[in-house]
Structure formats: structure tokens, C-alpha cells
Amino acid sequence: MPQNTLNIVILAAGKGTRMYSKMPKVLHRIGGKPMVGRVIDTAAALNPQNICVVIGHGKEQVLDTVKRDVVWVEQTEQLGTGHAVKTALPHLSAEGRTLVLYGDVPLIDVETLETLLEAAGNEVGLLTDVPNDPTGLGRIIRDSNGSVTAIVEEKDADAVQKAVKEINTGILVLPNAKLENWLNSLSSNNAQGEYYLTDLIAKAVADGIKVHPVQVRASHLAAGVNNKLQLTELERIFQTEQAQELLKAGVTLRDPARFDLRGRLKHGQDVVIDVNCIFEGDIELGDNVEIGANCVIKNAKIGANSKIAPFSHLESCEVGENNRIGPYARLRPQARLADDVHVGNFVEIKNAAIGKGTKANHLTYIGDAEVGCKTNFGAGTIIANYDGVHKHKTVIGDEVRIGSNCVLVAPVTLGNKVTTGAGSTITRNVEDNKLALARARQTVIEGWVRPEKDKQ
């Protein structure tokens, strides 16, 4: 039996009633990714022959959310873990081994599974744990020699068996040559009326096949999620581990307990991240980047020596070197900032290229635009890029000075060194070095009397 032929079955069909959610349990997220997606990633890292994911409750949602190249198998009736694996049998090879994982055990890692597979060899591998509280979990039963003889679910256990602290995590390695016969011989004559996968341990022992237990090195690696409390506990463990890795790599986290990474973070040296920041997707931070408190950054690249002030939101954007962003700034998708750009409070930029040294220090909207170098936006500048049907582009040259409270109505082009007077609405192109004024002349009415209410 070739030991290198590996099938993986991931059980993900349960209802998750204790989550009190319309969303299938396995789609609830850890670190920004659905739990079952994390398990698939871990499984794929083992380079198996195939991965079968058994789904049932909310299968349409699972398929719509987790778009992965795996074998999807439907369990139409939830009749237990043994029945779930049986539904995957047609997709498993006749020889080799099958590793059984769970879509609601999101933190299982490659190292643990490789250890289990090595220990199992061509026989049976069983991942166990000794938690502080084994209540509700299946107990590992051993004989006088310490060999595993069975797993007894708590509802079927007697007082002596319930006193056992070692529990079954559910993760198993099974020989394919025996798997079909063992599954076909399962009985549902138990307290749950289900076909228990755990009953295969006793069948292996009866067939003279050794069971190799491996105790997980940390309980959270094999911990399942049945409710929102357990979900948040694993989320915090996951985030703590990520924070520790960043600290070891030289990133300064002002408070590791108030840091969330929901993706991948690539960083240079001397990066500083303040409290309550959330990072999603793929993030790249250059040398000496500082992220202020309460920022949300998603799929962004930030160049060296740039400072992001508190309460700023950056999504799908590129920020050059030596930028000053925020506080309360928003960079939306396709915002592309060159070096030495200043974006101040309550400035929003979307689908726009901003040239080197340009400043928009406050209360400005820049959308669908191309802006040159060393241009300055006065407070309250708005680029009106949408006519109700289509978006239009605005082009602004180098060293342009846009007065406060101006509206640039796209499509429009401002040449180099153009100046616009405060309060202007610019609707036509302006050539280089010109001053554009587009506002009503002020009128002062002499002798005007302010009306007052009648006093009665």
C-alpha cells in the first residue's frame, strides 16, 4: 500500500445550530477567511491526491463563498461522521490513506498533520488531546499496555470512561484498503442514533491493525467551533500568534492585544503600528512606515517613510514614499499616490493618480482624475465626476493652485500652473498659466433692513 497516496476528506455538512446564524457554520470567519477555507488551505499544503469536502446544510452558500478546486460531495442526510465519510468513498483511491479533517477546526496546522501521518504509516493515526475540561467529548480508551482500543462518546460512556481526560479530536488517518468495509459495517445503535466515525478505532483493533495516537502540542490546534464564544476565542488566539510573529520580525505593535490581521502583511524595517488597526487582504508596508490608531487598511501598498494618521481608511490603493495621510482620510480603490503627497483630514480619493508633492490637506473629493506634481487643492474642492449616468475624467497639470470651495465639473482639463479663484465652478478647460474665475460678483445693498417678527 503506497504510503504517499493521500486522500483528504473534510467534513463540513453540519447545521451549526448553536451558532444561531443563517450562515453555515463553516463559513464563519477566522482571520477574515471562512473556517473551511482555512482547512482547505492546510489540506492542500500536504499535496494530497485529492481533497473531498462533504457539504450539506447551506451547500449553495458554501459553494458560492468557497470557490476552490476540490471535490464537493453532498451529504443529503446528516447521519453522523461515519456516514459523511462514506458519501466521499466513490472519490477515494483504492489504496493509500485517507486523512479526515473538519471544516470547523480552523487552526489545525501542517506540522501537526505531518507528524500524525508519519506516526500512522500504513495503519491508523489518531490525533488526541488532554484539555482542561473534556466534557462533551469522546474519550480515548486504552488497555493495560497503553494501546488504544476504542473511542467512546460521552453520551455512551460509563462513569469510569467519563473520568478519562484524554479525548478524541476527530482527526484520523485511515488505510483505504480497509475503509469501505469498516464504514459499511458501522451501526447507528447508540445514544445519538448516528454512524460514528470513531467506531472505526475498535474495528481496526479487531482486525489487528495498530492505532497510533499522537497528542496535539496545543489544544487550540484541534479545537472545534460550535458557538460564537468558541469562535472569538480561536480568533483571539490566531491574532495573538500573528502579532507574536510580527514582533519577532521587528515590527513595533503598540499593543499586540489590539491588532487584527485578516490577510498577509509584508513589511520592511522599523514599522510602527498603533492600537486598534485592522489589516485585510494583501498589505505591504515599506521601511519606517507608521500606522496611527484605528486605521483600516485593505489590499494596500505603502511606501517607505510614509505616515498614516489615525482613523484613516485605505483600500486597494498605492501610496508612495514620504506621504502624509490623514487623520480621517479615505483612499478608495485605484487611488495611486506618488512620493511626498499630503492627504489631510476628510479627503477622499478614488481612481485617481496623484503626482509627486501634491497636497490636498482638507475637505476634498478627488475622483476619476489625473493630477500632476506640486499641485495644491484648497479646502472644500470637489471634482464632480458623475453626470448621473457616466463617470468622467478630470486632468490637472503641475503646480496648479485650486482655490477653496471650487467645483471642477468633469470632463475638464486644467493646464500647468493654472490658478482657480475660491468658490469657482469650473466647467471648461483652462490653458497653462491662466487664472480661472467662475462665480457671481458680490453685490452689497445699501439701506437694506433685516425683517423682524412682529412683537405681540
UniProtKB/Swiss-Prot annotation:
Transmembrane intervals: none
Binding site for acetyl-CoA: 379, 385-386, 404, 422, 439
Cellular component terms per the entry's GO annotation: cytoplasm; membrane
Annotated region described as Linker, given as residue ranges: 229-249
A single BP term in Gene Ontology: cell morphogenesis
Binding site for UDP-N-acetyl-alpha-D-glucosamine: 11-14, 25, 75, 80-81, 102-104, 138, 153, 168, 226, 332, 350, 365, 376
Active site: 362
Localization annotation: Cytoplasm
Co-factor: note: Binds 1 Mg(2+) ion per subunit.
Pathway in which the depicted protein is active: Nucleotide-sugar biosynthesis; UDP-N-acetyl-alpha-D-glucosamine biosynthesis; N-acetyl-alpha-D-glucosamine 1-phosphate from alpha-D-glucosamine 6-phosphate (route II): step 2/2; Nucleotide-sugar biosynthesis; UDP-N-acetyl-alpha-D-glucosamine biosynthesis; UDP-N-acetyl-alpha-D-glucosamine from N-acetyl-alpha-D-glucosamine 1-phosphate: step 1/1; Bacterial outer membrane biogenesis; LPS lipid A biosynthesis
Annotated stretches, region: N-acetyltransferase: 250-456
EC numbers, comma separated: 2.7.7.23, 2.3.1.157
SUPFAM superfamilies on file: Nucleotide-diphospho-sugar transferases, Trimeric LpxA-like enzymes
Cofactor(s) the record lists: Mg(2+)
Annotated region (Pyrophosphorylase), positions in chain: 1-228
Self-association state and partner proteins as the record states: Homotrimer.
Name by which UniProt lists this protein: Bifunctional protein GlmU
Species per Swiss-Prot/TrEMBL record: Neisseria meningitidis serogroup B (strain ATCC BAA-335 / MC58)
Source lineage: Bacteria, Pseudomonadati, Pseudomonadota, Betaproteobacteria, Neisseriales
